[in-house]
Amino acid sequence: MRHYFIYILALTACLTIAGCSDDDGLAPSYADKNRFMATDSATNAVSALRNKFYWETGSYLLFNDTLRHETIGTDAAGTPLYANELLDVSYVMASNAQQTAFKYQYLTLFSDMEQGVTFLKTYILPHLGPKLRPFSWLLVSHITRYTVSDNVYSYDAEPQCAVGNRATALALDVLDGADDEVMQTTAAGILVDLLSTKVAQQPAKALNTFTQYSAVYYNHDVAEPHYDDDANMQDMYNAGFIDGYYSWGFLFYGHYPTQSDDIASFVKLALTKTEQEVSTQYTNYPTIFTKYQAMRQLLTDLGYVY
């Protein structure tokens, strides 16, 4: 099974202005080619599956990250030259974005690809309105995430899901031989990851209905911290949080979570608990229940279907 790295790409836009006569025409280098869609002439089973998925769901379907691999000529020695375009799931148009890279193991059996599509249609897509569906899905067997600093790649995690601007990648090796319970649990985790990212990307004004309740505490130290699990969680609950602050997988006492972590915690709560369950569990912490209701409404407004 081949492994591929998706590297962080530096995107530079270069604009050259030259004088043109009325007879001059402008033509892009490879006009009107949709790299996410299988070609109209493709008749193999994988291409047919991809195209059918797009027409049925509105999202493109990929099974590897290579969008383009075409010969563009030869060099002086006669060696073929290729133009390559890779899908960079982690690419974000922001200079301060955390740099990450992903290593994929591809699905190689058509039956596994079909199973992945069935999983999407059965457990994921029914919950996602048009605004929440990604531009494309990249279905693979396994994902390994790396952080990148000064061109040094450090192992980070093996996520089930990687959410990007142009694609959401899903690792489906866990589905091999899985029963309905495992399918549902896997789908729940994927939906939490996907929706946490979608919510965090919303404008501050839209998020304010949720963030206003704990905004003054985000990523700040507790005024009078406690250094045991129970007392630390009391500090969190009193400020409207349902989890503590973690860094590199370790819990830090006396520090409040970040906004993004708070969003992820409440997205999970909104997707997995009923109002009655939350009201009972956090009966002494009305701010938590209010934030739960605000998050459910946010998700509904974005098009989530409970």
Predicted regions and their residues:
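C-terminal motif of bacterial Sec signal peptides marking the signal peptidase cleavage site
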Residues: 15-19
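Hydrophobic helical h-region of N-terminal Sec-dependent signal peptides
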Residues: 10-13
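Structured domain cores in non-transmembrane regions
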Residues: 150-181, 283-305
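Acidic/polar, low-complexity intrinsically disordered N-terminal segments immediately downstream
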Residues: 21-117, 281-306
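Positively charged n-region of N-terminal signal peptides that target proteins for export
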Residues: 1-6
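Metalloprotease/metallohydrolase-associated module, dominated by Zn2+-dependent proteases
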Residues: 216-306
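Active-site recognition of the HExxH zinc-binding catalytic motif
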Residues: 167-216
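Auxiliary, metal-adjacent structural segments of Zn-dependent hydrolase domains
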Residues: 110-165
